[in-house]
């Protein structure tokens, strides 16, 4: 386990990116073919470029076009442009030397090279490359990199163990592991909120948040404390201090936030459950981007004690899982008992099943990218023609711009009340994007906030009426996860217009990984009336089973 005292972990600083030392070619095994001199020269030049992080030279060494390949433990990149975009964000690699290199000719103008890297700071890595002579130059057409094994991925985890904290030995969640978003109190540890300055000054917590304790009492163990976007004030999933967690479904794409760490941990198989928060979409967005199940619970249904707030009027707690059955187990336990010491199941509004009737909000579909809308329409048509056809009808939700504007105003006012004093005392401590959101929030007046709250009241009433006798269904987000190199401002605005209404109304919403668009996952969101969270997960599993059976 790391960070066992709750203290700030030692920063991991890459070794200086100095040029690789000139080395004689490692001796080839007896009988092995010798590497052609011009190919070895190209390989050595590539090594110098990669250690120096010479992006232009590295781009020039990979063959142009859409068929060039590069893979590593995170997944496969296809095409020169995708590889170049990944490399621009990666940063340099630690200093290393080539310990071994092996050559196998594949033809007169193509060859396989496999090499072992010895890192100056310890550890070894493996590179497999296919080189081809194109227009007189040796270029890489395919590469696979096996990096040295890290102690932990600091983009995903603040602290991690096996387990980090053991739960009860028996219970309905026994054997499952949890990635806890770095907003929840764990006795003896600090809350870091995705910011190293905040973590450094925080005091260890004296008690564990009920949302964490519930999972431990049910037999789950904690895998660790997972990263969050700073102060949970983002939906992209990036963090300027710790880096961007990998998207477990789409290489080089944003993971979605602000519950980025728990989502990536679950998607990559590091944990079974992500304990997360959702204010404006921070569970639903990463669930959609990474092909996960994600439940935003009814507002105030799960106690928020011991959770660092962003905007209390909308903050809610929920979970991310890889499958619907696990999400059902978590919801059944965490939402069905009457108090922490009770063994009686109290299902309340979830005692009955939700209707097999769905409404599709037209205004939300207007925010959806064409390919995603087409995939969603095909799904609904197939379900309607199935052996268990649900009914679908269109509904109107009014002006989403007005809803989002009012929501953002109230959210910003509360966020500034929660964190403004700290931000004023620590200028420059947060990244530019989050700093700008807080700057805008600081300008909101009491009159602005009161007016926005008044605007949200009829919107919440309308949504409650819409889901009174049916369940709302629509794509969770406009489309697949944007690449990390993309300009996400327009995507962010469209996404929040889709996710804010359910949050403004305090309704439960579940994202189901049902759509594929361009090979990437996109979720389908179901929204039901308040308090029906357990029944909503049951309905979502029925919906997903039917969708899976007709594909």
Segments (PLM) and residue ranges:
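Amidase signature
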Residues: 2-4, 148-173, 336-496
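Intrinsically disordered, low-complexity proline-rich tandem-repeat tracts
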Residues: 6-31
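Surface-exposed, charged secondary-structure patches
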Residues: 38, 69-70, 77-124
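Short, solvent-exposed secondary-structure junction/capping segments
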Residues: 40, 44-51, 59-75, 278
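Hydrophobic pocket/interface hotspot
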Residues: 46, 58-59, 66, 79, ...
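Gly/Ser-rich catalytic/binding loops embedded in alpha/beta enzyme cores
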Residues: 105-107, 114-115, 129-271
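Structural helix-boundary/capping segments
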Residues: 146-152, 268, 273, 279-364, ...
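General beta-strand structural signal in soluble alpha/beta enzymes
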Residues: 180, 222-227, 275-277, 393-395, ...
């Amino acid at each position: 386990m790391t960070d066992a005292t709750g203290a700030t972990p030692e920063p991991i600083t890459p070794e200086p990116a100095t040029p690789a030392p000139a080395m004689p070619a490692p001796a080839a095994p007896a009988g092995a073919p010798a590497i052609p001199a011009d190919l070895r020269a190209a390989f050595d030049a590539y090594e110098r470029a990669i250690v120096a992080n010479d992006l232009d030279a590295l781009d020039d060494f990979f063959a142009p076009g859409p068929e060039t390949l590069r893979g590593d433990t995170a997944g496969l990149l296809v095409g020169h442009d995708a590889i170049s975009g990944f490399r621009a964000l990666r940063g340099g690699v630690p200093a290393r030397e080539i310990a071994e290199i092996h050559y196998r000719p594949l033809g007169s103008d193509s060859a396989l090279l496999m090499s072992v890297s010895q890192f100056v700071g310890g550890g070894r890595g493996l590179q497999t490359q296919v080189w081809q002579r194109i227009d007189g130059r040796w270029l890489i057409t395919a590469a696979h990199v096996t990096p040295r094994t890290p102690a932990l991925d600091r983009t995903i985890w603040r602290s991690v163990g096996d387990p980090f904290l053991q739960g009860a030995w028996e219970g309905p969640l026994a054997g499952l592991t949890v990635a806890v978003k770095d907003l929840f109190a764990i006795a003896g540890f600090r809350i870091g909120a995705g910011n190293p300055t905040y973590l450094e000054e925080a005091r260890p917590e004296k008690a564990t948040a009920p949302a964490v304790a519930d999972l431990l009492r049910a037999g789950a163990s904690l895998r660790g404390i997972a990263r969050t976007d700073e102060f949970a004030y983002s939906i992209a999933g990036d963090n300027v201090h710790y880096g961007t967690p990998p998207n477990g479904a789409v290489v080089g794409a944003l993971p979605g936030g602000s519950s980025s760490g728990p989502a990536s941990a679950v998607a990559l198989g590091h944990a079974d459950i992500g304990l997360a928060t959702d204010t404006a979409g921070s569970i639903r967005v990463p669930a959609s981007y990474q092909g996960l199940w994600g439940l935003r619970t009814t507002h105030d249904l799960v106690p928020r004690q011991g959770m660092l707030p962003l905007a209390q009027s909308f903050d809610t707690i929920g979970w991310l899982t890889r499958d619907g059955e696990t999400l059902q187990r978590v919801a059944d336990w965490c939402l069905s008992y009457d108090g922490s010491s009770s063994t009686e199941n109290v299902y309340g509004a979830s005692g009955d099943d939700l209707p097999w009737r769905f409404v599709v909000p037209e205004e939300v579909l207007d925010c959806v990218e064409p390919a995603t809308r087409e995939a969603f329409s095909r799904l609904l048509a197939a379900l309607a023609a199935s052996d268990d056809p649900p009914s679908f009808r269109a509904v109107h939700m009014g002006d989403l711009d007005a809803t989002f504007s009012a929501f953002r105003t109230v959210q910003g006012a509360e966020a500034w009340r929660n964190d403004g004093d700290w931000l004023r005392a620590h200028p420059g401590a947060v990244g530019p994007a989050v700093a700008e959101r807080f700057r805008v929030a600081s300008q909101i007046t009491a009159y602005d906030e009161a007016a926005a709250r008044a605007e949200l009241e009829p919107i919440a009433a309308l949504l409650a009426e819409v889901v009174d006798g049916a369940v709302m269904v629509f794509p969770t987000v406009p489309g697949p996860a944007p690449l990390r190199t993309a300009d996400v401002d327009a995507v962010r605005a469209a996404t929040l217009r889709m996710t804010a209404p359910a949050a403004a109304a305090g309704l439960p919403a579940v994202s189901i990984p049902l759509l594929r668009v361009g090979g990437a996952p996109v979720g389908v969101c179901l929204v039901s009336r308040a308090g029906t969270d357990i029944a909503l997960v049951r309905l979502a599993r029925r919906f997903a089973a039917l969708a899976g059976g007709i594909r």
